[in-house]
Amino acid sequence: MRTRLHRLVLAGVATASTLLPVAAVGSATPPAPTAAAHGSLGENFMWGVAASGFQSEGHAPDSNWERYIQNNPDWDRYRNSIDFRSRYPNDIALAAGLGVKVFRIGIEWARLQPTPDTWDENGFAFYDSVIDTILENGMQPMLTLDHWVYPGWALDRGGWNNPGMVQDWLTNMRKVVDRYASRNPVWVTVNEPVAYIMHEVRQNDTVADHMLDEVAQAHNEIYDYIHQVQRGALVTSNVGYVAGAENKVNGPLMERIGGKLDFIGVDYYFGYEPPSNSVSQPDGSAATPKGMWELPVRPEGIYYALQHYSEKFPGKPLWVVENGMPTEDGKPRADGYTRSDHLRDTVYWLQRAKADGMNVVGYNYWSLTDNYEWSSYTPRFGLFTVDAKSDPNLKRTPTDAVDSYRRIVAANGVPSTYVPVRLPSECGLVDPPASCDDPVTVP
């Protein structure tokens, strides 16, 4: 399993999940549609939006990612991203205007601890104000402790190759928990650990298996600490779901941390695309997509992702911590599928999952605004689009999905008469073998 994990990480499964080969699965014709209810998600459903620290804040201190960008001259320069650091009151107000209950942000370790022996009170004061503004706008903060970014001095020590990294990490994270537990946040310890490992393998020659063990230890220890400090806390580490290979990719992680998750946090974006379906290279191999916007969007796949974890953790709450759809620089997609289409279709499948007995409790849209997608500003995920490359004013322009999400939140779902714009794909293109063993249909 360790050797397999290393190979998977090196292959980049977490961000190019649809290109990962799995055992051959026939693309069986789905059975005739049968009636299926998709009732309201309920008044207690936790609608939210999501962002991360480094991707949005700008004015970045020295960190591993600042250096990775410097080491890759072909990447977009970071500059000040979309400047959430200066514009957070307006962005938080935009989120509140959607009617959502949760605003997810990251707390950047690099901003809080510039050297091993010093803490920056100005960094803490910034997050004090952000979190208080979220609360003042009637939303609950969801705080991510580690969204792949750590101080430059920690990289100098070897990053996650350093045997002392877990203790350095815990020293900071305990301070963060002590400071903000009284605000009653929801906690995400480590964002998408397998994708995190993938980036560290590529950029810092990190040993994948070692980092998996270290990240799991960090999660488990801070989970216990949060529960000591904050009564009734909700703590998770969200997985980046990999259609067609979830057990192989995230299984080793869940074996290590599954006993210390108060809810299962799932990030779902893309379906499975067998390489043989897109042959275009002279040697007969599949072409690598130019960008995320070319990866297969299968909204019904979120049903199988939730089903997967509902079966593995019966009765455990399920929260979609991230979900969205990329476009290329905000341009209309070649297939004509809009952000509103994708959002409504996805919510339809959330309602189907809930109606079928899955304990779905929350959904965060990724993301409130466009941001820096770990090397590029070209992939756009935002409800509000921002042209970080050419607009010096960084204007937030609402997409068609803003009004759609506002209506969805107000109604706690799509209408009972709603029919998805994008009907289910052939089962072998969604999440095999599950999507072929028991395919869902639209009545």
Language-model features, listed with the residues they occupy:
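Active-site region of glycoside hydrolase catalytic domains
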Residues: P33-Y68, N72, A125-A334, L343-V442
